[in-house]
């Protein structure tokens, strides 16, 4: 079908006030135009459009929305069918500017505003095909007004179409001609960066990226551009972050003055290389390699020489691909940005700190040893980031420190690292140094010794911070591991291990004394000591005996009114709990404890005494000396630590100390059973009063200790026996039962001469009879446990004193309230005795 129309009739119909007529005409015209695209010549279509375009453009202002919409579609159809020409350009653009380029919103319909900006985009694309046709530049003021209005539109689709038009225009515009308009377009685009729709933010970034290639780089506009776009590197949507990286790639490849802005462009790309989303990394990384190739080609003379001597890094991190020499060169010329990056690691926003550390990681990865000179500048900020309260942030800081330890020149940074530790005895510097030092391959004997001595000093090893303690132990473990790779004599290694041991045992002691802290650090320290034991070919007890006294010497400032939570008290308490009491340092330990008892507060005294009482349970296991020496040391310990507190004194603290002294004595009797036989008799004079003490705990430990008073004469044991019998009437049921059991375990040592022996036996028989009377009395007790304890003791006494048992039974039987129970007990004990006699006779036969 031909494109034959009655142009005059169409023009007349378009001027009609009948909406239906105009829409019908426009529909027919649109259909014919679409059909003519493939069947009619361009000249024919152009001839028709020349006759109609003024009336069509006039319809843009029609009061009916449907007419305006159809008119725009018809004009766009004609423009699409026509060859590239600027004949109608000014008229169409002017009309669009009237409808879309004013400050106020002239066109109320969102859909028609979208058609307007789509038509402008179409015309820009057509202009691109016209190559060097200069009429369009005359339209820049009008076009820019339309674009700005579209970007500010409330309708997101219109905004995105406007951004698309900006991108298209930026691709074909001449920089010198278009530059005056860039800043006015950028302003609404910056506002659009905060749009709630991710797709709108992406469109804005694309437009800004293209406009940046035309900007005047000499002013503040470029600085503002980076400030506005950079926050989107932390956008929640991966596609937005990817677009920011794409903008960086575009500027690295095409920006004329890119060398001046490498420091600001690189973060846009490097952050995407550390992005957690694969779709960001996989899109940006190949293009980043192209940037490196371009930079290498532009600086081939310099980089080719560097490439020749570019050896593989020995300690490169696993699963990390080394950047190309071109990419590394790009970053190495932009190290001035590090100060800005490290400053952001202290920002109040969590995501900003994390973003800065990820960026710093990429800088270290690309700069490698060239970054060594900047280490001292960023050491403090990175150290602070290592103790960030957000786990994800401090984990990223640890990765950066690890990478720095691997890639930076060890000999150049190690002295700065030590200097930071010496000046700043804080957990932050410790963590940072640990990650760097552990990851590095360096470490001489002198450096390891210097580090071990530094950690041994009170500023480090006496800390009460659990996190600090943990990293001290980890750094000590690193020192031990690195000793396997150094050249040092056995004596030198032993000196080094000595410092490591002393530091480790102090940290473990303090860690064990802290409340609400697990055993993780203590267990880790034990593993560390066991590792040293293997290297020294010795045992854990021997290493304690050899070096523990050095740790004890570091417990200072005890001569003050310290509470139980004071660091010196906690250290001494932890040391006692960790290693107990050993022969090599028992004298030093006694002196330290005496100072505590003399000067420290009540709570501190009680705490130390409690630990001592537990430690004495292991006396026979930890005292690796002959029995005679062990007995002598036990006697000294008891006389100086325990005995002074067995006598009664007024006051709550004195009462607590008396209880603990009795507990310690009881523990010693169990832990040093053979040695206590010789030591305890001298303390028998205190026992009667202790057995009658007002404090139930004191009486409890006293009655438990009574049975360990052995090898004593009848005269010395007699007061203990009667005091023990009195405890069978104690208010505490537990003490009554223990007293009943204790009477069967008291064994005197009789005199060697017959006369004295007979006399002492008579005295002891009287004591036994008295005990039997009491036991028979308590056998009628309603307490089941008490009756059982009485039966056990009577069985022992009846066996050793049968005549006395028979006599006391006959005496008690008439007075017994429950004769059947007493008779049953008598029969049971007598049967046992008879059966025992028969078995003995049979064995003799």
From Swiss-Prot:
HEAT repeat coordinates: 47-84, 138-175, 180-217, 260-297, 332-369, 523-561, 674-715, 766-803
InterPro entries to which the protein is assigned, alphabetical: ARM-like, ARM-type_fold, DAAF5, HEAT_DAAF5
Sorted UniProt keywords: Cilium biogenesis/degradation, Cytoplasm, Repeat
Gene Ontology terms, MF aspect: dynein intermediate chain binding
Phenotype of the disrupted gene, per the record: Homozygous deletion-mutant flies are not viable. The larvae are smaller but do not display obvious morphological phenotype. RNAi-mediated knockdown in sensory neurons affects flies movement coordination and impairs hearing. Testis-specific RNAi-mediated knockdown does not alter spermatogenesis and in particular the formation of sperm axonemes but it impairs sperm motility.
GO CC, any one term: cytoplasm
Role of this protein: Cytoplasmic protein involved in the delivery of the dynein machinery to the motile cilium. It is required for the assembly of the axonemal dynein inner and outer arms, two structures attached to the peripheral outer doublet A microtubule of the axoneme, that play a crucial role in cilium motility.
Compartments where located: Cytoplasm; Dynein axonemal particle
UniProt protein name: Dynein axonemal assembly factor 5
One GO BP: outer dynein arm assembly
Organism whose genome encodes this protein: Drosophila melanogaster (Fruit fly)
UniProt record similarity statement: Belongs to the DNAAF5 family.
Expression tissues: Expressed in testis.
